[in-house]
Amino acid sequence: MSAAQGWDRNRRRGGGAAGGASGVSGAGAAGGGRGTGQLNRFVQLSGRPHLPGKKKIRWDPVRRRFIQSCPIIRIPNRFLRGHRPPPARSGHRCVADNTNLYVFGGYNPDYDESGGPDNEDYPLFRELWRYHFATGVWHQMGTDGYMPRELASMSLVLHGNNLLVFGGTGIPFGESNGNDVHVCNVKYKRWALLSCRGKRPSRIYGQAMALINGSLYVFGGTTGYIYSTDLHKLDLNTMVWTQLKPNNLSCDLPEERYRHEIAHDGQRIYILGGGTSWTAYSLNKIHAYNLETNAWEEIATKPHEKIGFPAARRCHSCVQIKNDVFICGGYNGEVILGDIWKLNLQTFQWVKLPATMPEPVYFHCAAVTPAGCMYIHGGVVNIHENKRTGSLFKIWLVVPSLLELAWEKLLAAFPNLANLSRTQLLHLGLTQELIERLK
């Protein structure tokens, strides 16, 4: 069967992995238009921060600004100095630590945008990028070992210095799926394949994955033809896969789906949204898997006063800060969404944030730093033109600590701080933790 035939059959039967021409009628297209709604204001960073005058900084007004407006900050390409930024893409994944945003994989059918003859894996991106927060520099990481070829709608989590990648699909979508766990140590820049035993998941993409108490949990996904409601667990100590069999009747299980997201509180795994090529699931009620009772539960959430519930969606992003879960963007089957919502896992109360994404997207990726700053990258921004973006945005989801506010002011005042030696930085009074953020 030719690749073209594979794509055609996938349009009819399965879900797209990264948003494509099939997305209007299939699962995972990405949609169009630019949102004009905004918070109080969007802040666009200049090419290089200027050196401010010696003016005393008053922190209280700065903190109030974050509380009231939750500003979304666009990081334009001209600020990403030193290296070219990643080409526009969709279906990729990202994670973040205190120092870097790591972006893996992705898809773009536009030959020129995806690198033309220089991209041997067109229309996919077999590459790992790092965005350094302190300097605003993108860097394509050179790595050793075998980098996986399933580069769209895979799952990605960060475990210490290791990126854990599971599943995903190559081209044609649904014909070259994976079910291996690949590990990349970002410190030593080396890939390895985990040798696992037991009942592993099918070869799928669009599944959701979480790291809980030393185990990976994988739920849902699609083969490209069949959607799944299976739940698997990989114990990272024994490297044994187990297919969990919940104590429920089949009618009480969550609907089969892909491109959903999951959150957890250590006791339950919560399924947020997702869908199939013909539907997107509601967020009014969510399913939760109880790790202690081995059973699925259905939880009714509470609507935002005067606004109601968030729209049903798939292909959105989700990050978590303690018991607060934030979802943004996505596609509801008709339009691309640009809203941001918060769900508290103790009260199950939905709150709509006052921010609106400058570019409504789906099939994008998002990650949150330990300090509470979310970064959003890429995605599809126009359904009819099948257009992707390479934009990078950030938004503080919590009030930044005094340390974080001072750190951002310091970086703005001294943009070449990263060029100083460790000894010089210590003499300036920087802590070891902050020095590590510069390297």
UniProtKB/Swiss-Prot annotation:
Pfam families: Kelch_4 (PF13418), Kelch_KLHDC2_KLHL20_DRC7 (PF24681). Disruption phenotype: No visible phenotype in normal conditions. Mice are protected against TNF-alpha-induced systemic inflammation: they show a reduction in the inflammatory response, but not in early systemic necroptosis. Coiled coil: none annotated. The modification Omega-N-methylarginine is found at residue 13. GO terms for molecular function: ubiquitin-like ligase-substrate adaptor activity. It comes from the Eukaryota. InterPro entries: Kelch-typ_b-propeller (IPR015915), Kelch_1 (IPR006652), KLHDC10 (IPR052125). The keyword Secreted does not apply. Kelch repeats lie at residues 87-154, 155-198, 199-260, 261-319, 320-364, 365-403. One of its GO terms (biological process) is ubiquitin-dependent protein catabolic process via the C-end degron rule pathway. Residues 1-50 are annotated as: Disordered. Residues 15-36 have a biased composition (Gly residues). SUPFAM superfamilies: Kelch motif, NHL repeat. Residues 398-439 are annotated as: Interaction with CUL2. Its main location: nucleus. Gene3D superfamilies: Kelch-type beta propeller (2.120.10.80). GO terms for cellular component: Cul2-RING ubiquitin ligase complex; cytoplasm; nucleoplasm. Keywords: Cytoplasm, Kelch repeat, Methylation, Nucleus, Repeat, Ubl conjugation pathway. It is found in: Nucleus; Cytoplasm. Pathway: Protein modification; protein ubiquitination. SMART domains: Kelch. Belongs to the KLHDC10 family. Substrate-recognition component of a Cul2-RING (CRL2) E3 ubiquitin-protein ligase complex of the DesCEND (destruction via C-end degrons) pathway, which recognizes a C-degron located at the extreme C-terminus of target proteins, leading to their ubiquitination and degradation. The C-degron recognized by the DesCEND pathway is usually a motif of less than ten residues and can be present in full-length proteins, truncated proteins or proteolytically cleaved forms. Component of a CRL2 E3 ubiquitin-protein ligase complex, also named ECS (Elongin BC-CUL2/5-SOCS-box protein) complex, composed of CUL2, Elongin BC (ELOB and ELOC), RBX1 and substrate-specific adapter KLHDC10. Interacts (via the 6 Kelch repeats) with PPP5C. This is Kelch domain-containing protein 10. The gene is Klhdc10.
